[in-house]
Design a protein with these regions (language model features):
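Substrate-binding surface in catalytic domains of secreted glycosidases
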Residues: 244-257
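Fungal secretory targeting signals
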Residues: 1-21
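C-terminal helix/juxtamembrane-tail motif
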Residues: 352-362
Length: 362
């Protein structure tokens, strides 16, 4: 048997490590996806696929009318005026959508609730408990666990499986978008996140092919509270970041190492490039940036996230031209800045990831 020198062995091992390095991916958000018509779905999914997008994050809040310039089929939120007031329209709509998305190589990340709905009193949680008591009241916690159970037990006629079993369609579940925003009681929030993550895990009934994630905060540091790293039920910690100081490799890298040491994965679940010259984390008003300037911002910040080893979800990619409302981060498919975002999405798929998500992607 011929023995390798230490130097030769090092080269071989390095080559093997490079060969099997996990690849990153790009993803997007569309909170009103359940309202899309079939043709809008086709436009969106075709565009996302062309940009290398592997996951789309969707919400279960009700929406109506024209949303972000998209004339949608209106739908109610999952729950209404009381804990027994269920409307499964949003789930039924997403049954069809997730099956169609599968054909484009895309899975869904399901956000089970949003702080936006809580704060806006769009269902009974806000009306009964408000943003203060919702995270600590024992009855509210029990009722929200029932919501989680209801969602995961929902059966999709497209595959005859519950959502908890539908790993071919679903990438991950999160309890709530930007829970307790702003974070007035961090200990209570950390406890709530872990409690709800365990509830999701329990309702997955041993299915480890679907991930459990948080729903982010308003910036990097408050997206990654210390208690999340020690919660055994959380697989993924989600970052939301719009400030330019947060869209920086040197800011993100220490958290990557912290997550790896804790056995967690990270995703940049929300980020965006403002259409105007307003502050990027307060994208209201201001004058439109030149196409080339915004293109450069998109490419620069996406590359910085890629370099940190974190997959990213853009906020948001639309199936129609961006109408340029307030908080204007959106990019429409085949609209201004689409070429830059599409190129960034494809580049993400070639970047190395600090975390191996390949078992959870199509």
């Amino acid at each position: 048997m011929k023995l390798l020198s230490l130097a030769s062995l090092t080269v071989v091992l390095s080559s093997v490590a490079t060969t099997f390095a996990a690849k990153s991916f790009s993803a997007s958000n569309l909170y009103y996806a359940a309202g899309l018509t079939d043709s809008q779905q086709t436009t969106l999914l075709t565009g996302l696929q062309s940009a290398g997008v592997k996951v789309l994050r969707v919400w279960l809040d009700g929406q109506s009318g024209s949303t972000k310039g998209t004339p949608i089929n209106s739908f109610n939120g999952l729950q209404g005026t009381g804990p027994d007031d269920w409307d499964d329209t949003v789930l039924n709509r997403l049954d069809n959508f997730m099956a169609k998305a599968h054909g484009y190589g895309i899975k869904l990340l399901i956000s089970i609730h949003s702080y936006n709905a809580l704060e806006g009193n769009r269902d009974f949680y806000g009306k009964y408990y408000g943003t203060g008591d919702f995270y600590t009241n024992t009855q509210a916690i029990a009722q929200f666990k029932q919501r989680i159970a209801h969602v995961l037990a929902h059966k999709n006629p497209k595959n005859g499986k519950t959502w908890a079993q539908s790993s071919e369609y679903i990438f991950a579940f999160e309890a709530q978008n930007e829970a307790m925003h702003p974070q007035g009681n961090k200990p209570a929030l950390q406890s709530w996140q872990c409690t709800m993550a365990k509830s999701i895990k329990d309702n997955l009934q041993g299915n480890t092919k679907i991930l459990v994630t948080t729903g982010g905060g308003s910036y990097v540091d408050d997206s990654l509270l210390d208690g999340y790293f020690s919660c055994s039920s959380l697989d993924v910690l989600a970052i939301h970041a719009y400030g330019t100081g947060d869209l920086n490799t040197s800011k993100l890298k220490p958290y990557v190492e912290k997550a790896k040491n804790a056995g967690k994965k990270l995703i940049m679940q929300e980020w965006g490039a403002c259409y105007t010259n307003a502050a990027n984390n307060n994208c209201n008003g201001g004058s439109p940036l030149s196409t080339s300037t915004r293109d450069a911002n998109i490419k620069q910040w996406a590359a910085a996230i890629d370099a940190s080893g974190i997959p990213w979800f853009y906020w948001q990619i639309l199936p129609n031209p961006d109408p340029h409302y307030d908080w204007d981060y959106e990019v429409g498919i085949n609209d201004v800045n689409w070429g830059a975002l599409k190129a960034a999405g494809l580049a993400a798929g070639q970047a190395e990831s600090a975390f191996d998500f390949s078992p959870y992607l199509l």
